[in-house]
Every structure is written in C-alpha cells, then in structure tokens.
Amino acid sequence: MNLKKVVNEIRNFEGILRKIAIKDVVETFDFNDEDYEFDIIVDFGDDAAVIGIDGDNAILLAADGIWGKLLEADPWWAGYCSVLVNCKDIAAMGGKCVGMTNIISIKDKDICREVLKGVKDGVKKFGVPMVGGHTHPDAMCNVLDVSITGIAKKDCILRSDNAKIGDKIIFAYDLVGQIYKSFPLNWDTTTMKSKKLVRAQMDALVQIAENKLANSCKDISNPGAIGTLGMLLEVSRKGGVVDITKIPKPEEIDLIHWLKVYPGSGYVLTAKEENFKEIKDIFEDVEMTAEICGEVIAEKKLYITDGENKEVVFDFEKEFICGC
C-alpha cells in the first residue's frame, strides 16, 4: 500500500480543508470573561455544545449547514441529511434528541419543495420533530441550516476532548448500505432500514455513555474517518496511531474513497481495552460493526499504518484541522 498517497489524499480532501475556517470563529468568542446563568460545560470543537441546567441534567445544542454541493446534487437528499446529521451529532454525545428548528433560504421554489420533502421524511425516520424556524422567501441562493436540541445526564456525556493516552481507537459503522446515487461521498444506511433499527443505532451511544464505557466519541462526518479522528485528537491534545487496514469497510469500496465517505451511521471512539467487548456487543446488537484500529498516544501526531509502514497525517504541534 502506498501510504504517502493515502496521506496526500486525506490532507487535500475538501471535507477536511473546509474545517480550517472554524478557528477564526472560535477565536472571536471567549466564555471565560462572561457571567452566564447556566454552566457551559462544552462549547466549540465538539459535535454539540453542552449546557448544564441543574445539578443532574444538561441540554445539548448543535447546528449544521448543508453543503451547497449536496443541495445542488440532490435537494431531497440534502433535506433528509439535514435531519440525519443533526440527530447523529446528539447521539455521538450520548444524548437523546428533543427537537429541531431550521432556516431555509429560497431562490427556486421547486428545489425548496424537494428539500422540505426530504426534511419531512427524515423527521419520520428519526422520530425527532421539526418545531419551527425561519424562512427567507426571496433569497439569492438556496440554503438550508438546521439546529437541534438534545438532553443528557451531565455525568454521562461522550466528549470529543477526553481521549486518554493508551485508549484504544475504535471505529464503528453500519456496513449494510450503498453509496448514494447522486452523491458518491455519502454512504446511505438509513433510507432502506426500519425506523426501529435507525433509532436503536442512536440509542446505542446512550447506552455506551451511561455505562461509561468510552472516554471520547465523535460522529464521523464530512472530514471522513481519519479527518474526524484527527479533530478528536486535536481537541484532546493527543495523538494516535491507526492501522487503516483494520477500519471496517464494505468489500466493494476502495479504501481511500471509504476514508472520505460520510457514513449513514459511523462513529470513532476511544476507550480502555477492557471495555471493548462490551462496546462491540452493544453495536452488534444494532447491526453495526466495531473494531479496534489503533491507540491514543502522547505525541501530538496522527499516524496511519498498514501494519508494516507508518506515515504522519497531521502534526498538531505545527498545524490544526479546526483550531479548537
């Protein structure tokens, strides 16, 4: 395997490069100098913000803007995915989804109609209501943004920034699916599945969180498998070594392409090795595949290996993905 080629493909992948702009946004805000009524437990750099509302409970807040390329390629799928990605963000934190709001900007009414059909179908599939929002009826372009609220116990949150040295790196996927016909970077595992299974897959993360089996977790999103892991390690101020040949993948898909894919249901976690069997069993109960693929290290670099050779993908002492 040509690891240098893999590294080059990952480092130049648009799904990762688009995250660099986050740093400028983060540096604008400073919560340390403000006096807020509620406890901001987690803010930028995670799948959702976490705000404590009393001694035991927290609300989770997340938002996603749908990639313009996706909306142009397939408006229905863009609408459906706006629900999917938000629900997965809450699930990755070990939370339960409560409700969503949206902002939709309309230039083309036919496209808008398809987007809204997709949103409606997503709501039916994932069982999370769309309860309000804002509409721009005279916009210069078509844009869809969705926000979501979730709930969780304060002591049962799966954070991105809590990876520990020596943790095993675990990738978990639903491998039963298909590349989405009009957007090859998406692996669809939900449209053909029952509501019961799709929702159970999200609840699996709640079970892992409440049993305190993992130290950190992140939903695999637009940066792909390695990019998402890189973001987790960056905010944890750690590094890692990952054997990319051990990452679960469908046999028919090229490895480099798979490392860039946004899966319908996929997560990267770090956990003590002794907890892996229980984590694996929880995922298997909802028809997902989980494997140990690497280890968290103190050196702030992310390496990939094929079992023989090793290459640096990111050096967090010198560079960043999101700057959080």
From Swiss-Prot:
Stored InterPro entries: Methan_mark_2, PurM-like_C_dom, PurM-like_C_sf, PurM-like_N, PurM-like_N_sf, ThiL-like, UCP036540_AIR
UniProt-listed SUPFAM superfamilies: PurM C-terminal domain-like, PurM N-terminal domain-like
Any Pfam family hit: AIRS
A single BP term in Gene Ontology: thiamine biosynthetic process
Molecular-function annotations in GO: thiamine-phosphate kinase activity
Domain of life: Archaea
Protein name stated in the entry: Uncharacterized protein MJ0640
Species name: Methanocaldococcus jannaschii (strain ATCC 43067 / DSM 2661 / JAL-1 / JCM 10045 / NBRC 100440)
